[in-house]
Amino acid sequence: MKKYDRGWASLETGAALLIVMLLIAWGAGIWQDYIQTKGWQTEARLVSNWTSAARSYIGKNYTTLQGSSTTTTPAVITTTMLKNTGFLSSGFTETNSEGQRLQAYVVRNAQNPELLQAMVVSSGGTPYPVKALIQMAKDITTGLGGYIQDGKTATGALRSWSVALSNYGAKSGNGHIAVLLSTDELSGAAEDTDRLYRFQVNGRPDLNKMHTAIDMGSNNLNNVGAVNAQTGNFSGNVNGVNGTFSGQVKGNSGNFDVNVTAGGDIRSNNGWLITRNSKGWLNETHGGGFYMSDGSWVRSVNNKGIYTGGQVKGGTVRADGRLYTGEYLQLERTAVAGASCSPNGLVGRDNTGAILSCQSGTWRKSNSGSTVITGRIANGQQIPLPTGFSASQCSWSVSNAENPQGWKPNYFAGSVATYDANRIVKCGFYDEYNFHKGTFRADLTGKCSYVVACQN
């Protein structure tokens, strides 16, 4: 390069650097404005969320707020109130990035006191610049966004409305936010709490809840997935495939085409368990039960036996086979021997317990007649009785005639044969003062004989 061209090159380089510096400065300003705008948009969204929560709170408590406000005296809603009632999350801060605190002032409409209107106003903290207020007023999406520039009046975005703060009993200063909630807005909020929504609204389960009875006007509820209720009253039929009940099922009557299975007892308070067509009660496990197949007999299923530790009682009891007893047969009625009876073959007893049988139309004692036994017996033995007889039916005697002992000089007495109350025999003879017991030997001591006669 020639020396006379070097000055121009330096000038060109300096100009380029100047342009670059100007572009950097301009870009930095643009970036700063962008960051500020994003921050103000975020603040506007937070104000919108707060205002939406206040709107819902007013709608749900519309009647209460009517009673606590007038056209000049407001009911004031704070952030704490919205958090405590669940309209704002517990993590929502009490102030914004500039330290301003939001409150809603609710008053009655002057022209129509039955309606409510409200204004959300920020107070305290650091004032926003006008540029920020204008930007945020346009970005607020709930209610009519605005701002306070003179400390007395709330002005809407694009200066679309202007309202004195005193109309709502509110106080604030320059550089603060204001949001107007009109009577229409709050009436809609009140209707939201009363309207049943067809679709789910996130965070608003109350919009899908009925707070009173609903009358379908005899119309149907179709394609219902599940019906959960405390009670149900039906004037017609209830049709279904299966049913599960954790409590009681009550009704005047019930008809089932197939089976009824119960996990517990089946009880009837005042009625019968009625079956038809030769059916009755059956124990499925053991195959026994009761049924009737004709008009006369209650039958045992599969000819099962009937077992009880108590009594079986009836007018007559008939056994087609043998009649067994594990103890005794007790006949309670008595008959009189010689009296008439029918039919032959009856068995009875008299008042002493003796067995009677009906023979040829007359009650007769069984095995009537007498029995006599005789024998020899030694001293000290008991007179025996015939088999099957008691002492009250018999009489007996003993004698010592087989070995008599006559009188001898100096002898006190002769032979002896007696018995006591227990039929114990004293048999022998006296030799002066000495008694000799009778034995079975054929010696001088001798032996006694007995005779026993018994009558049935």
From Swiss-Prot:
Pfam families: Shufflon_N. The keyword Iron does not apply. Keywords: Plasmid. Residues 362-456 are annotated as: Variable region. The keyword Transmembrane does not apply. Residues 1-361 are annotated as: Constant region. InterPro entries: Enolase-like_N (IPR029017), Shufflon_N (IPR007001). This protein is expressed by a shufflon (= clustered inversion region that works as a biological switch). The orfs of this region share a constant N-terminus, while the C-terminus is variable. This is Shufflon protein D'. It comes from Escherichia coli. The lineage of its organism: Bacteria, Pseudomonadati, Pseudomonadota, Gammaproteobacteria, Enterobacterales.
